[in-house]
A protein has these predicted regions:
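C-terminal active-site subregion of NodB/CE4 polysaccharide deacetylases
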Residues: 1-62, 68-70, 135-234
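Histidine-centered catalytic micro-motifs
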Residues: 7-9, 122-130
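Active-site glycine- and acidic-residue-rich loops that bind
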Residues: 67, 98-107, 170-174
Length: 234
């Protein structure tokens, strides 16, 4: 089975980055590394059609929360280095700010989402209300998922059937986990992404527990290179 690292980013800034915020300078260094070393990027919907990955270095780039900074700072770099990415968007917050976090960072508007080039950016779900699934009932999770689907349909958006769990949280107790996965499947979701910080094998053994590497703003390029090769560093 082939190895497939999936990167997770959030806010991008022109200043120094830390934690979930990365500087545009460091982001460019990382994207340049991927391009210079021949990494092939995929949209998640492309993986749904594949039984195996092509030979060589493969990777998936994801951004959570739909920040305007991703449009302003990350998108030009994706274009420059000919990379693809998936933007996971909490739909109730379009045109607002990240009230679950700092309340100061702007989320893209509906019009900005529609302006994204689908050849470069794939849109995926990040729930509707950005709440932890571990703190919601099964009925609330289903209602949230259905609201996402309704919103996308009502507004003429094109989303892939992929979902990144807010905070990386999902029900792990066996009975609840089975209901959770069934709920997502019934509503057409085919991939669910957590965090985990491990390198995936492809095809995915657990398509609703796909792991991502949390790229911290303070990572050096060396640490980034180690993370995409090994995942968790002990």
């Amino acid at each position: 089975m082939a190895k497939l690292p999936i990167l997770m980013y959030h806010h991008v800034t022109v200043e120094d980055g830390k934690g979930l915020t990365i500087s545009v300078e460091n982001l460019e260094k990382q994207f340049n590394h991927l391009a210079e070393n021949g990494y092939k990027t995929f949209h998640l919907k492309e993986l749904l059609k594949l039984k195996e990955l092509p030979k060589g270095k493969n990777i998936v780039i994801t951004f959570d929360d739909g920040y305007v900074s991703q449009l302003d700072l990350a998108l030009p770099l994706l274009k420059k280095y000919k990379l693809k990415a998936t933007f996971f968007v909490p739909l109730d917050f379009l045109g607002k700010t990240d009230t679950w976090n700092t309340s100061s960072l702007e989320i893209m508007t509906l019009e900005q989402l529609k302006s994204l080039d689908s050849k470069i950016v794939e849109l995926g779900f990040h729930s509707f209300y950005h709440k932890k699934y571990t703190e919601l009932s099964n009925a609330e999770i289903e209602a949230d998922t259905r609201r996402c689907l309704e919103f996308v349909s009502e507004n003429g958006l094109r989303f892939s059937p992929v979902l990144a769990y807010p905070y990386g949280k999902f029900p792990k107790e066996k009975a609840r986990n089975e209901i959770f996965k069934k709920t997502l499947k019934i509503n057409g979701i085919e991939y669910g992404l957590r965090i985990g910080n491990r390198i995936n094998s492809f095809p995915f053994k657990k398509p609703f527990e796909i792991e991502r590497i949390d790229v911290k703003g303070e990572f050096s390029l060396l640490k980034f290179r180690q993370k995409i090769r090994f995942g968790k560093l002990f």
